Amino acid sequence: STVSGYTSGGSDTGLSNVIDKFPFSTDANATDVGDLTSTIFRTTGQSSTTHGYSSGGTTHPDGLYTGSADIIDKFPFAADANATDVGDLTVARYFSAGQSSTVSGYTTGGYGTAGLHDVIDKFSFSSDANATDAGDLSVARFIHTGQQY
């Protein structure tokens, strides 16, 4: 969205499922506009022109490399609403990076129960479905950033 920023999930004194929204046009506090399908943190974000996505993460409160998730949650930009689970990543993981093209979301790298991952997962914005393995990073990594051009 070019109108608002969104943030979802995370941790404060516990795990959160909150979807927050704030305007780009003026300096203002965020408001709670919905919930993810689970309390989760260390997720990855992607955006289409109409929806926000949260993928992967961990649902384990100690965050000690357990409880990795394969969830792909989707929520609308047009109306304040809860997210729906629309698919799964090929590998459950967290500390991944997120990228978005005009037609697909990507979740890259990360850490899961099997250790570091190099997988590039791709999921369609036009239909709700599981991600597919679109390739591999040059090295397995986690706690990295994602960009698109």
Regions found by a protein language model. Give the residues of each.
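Polar, enzyme-active/binding microenvironments
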Residues: 1-149
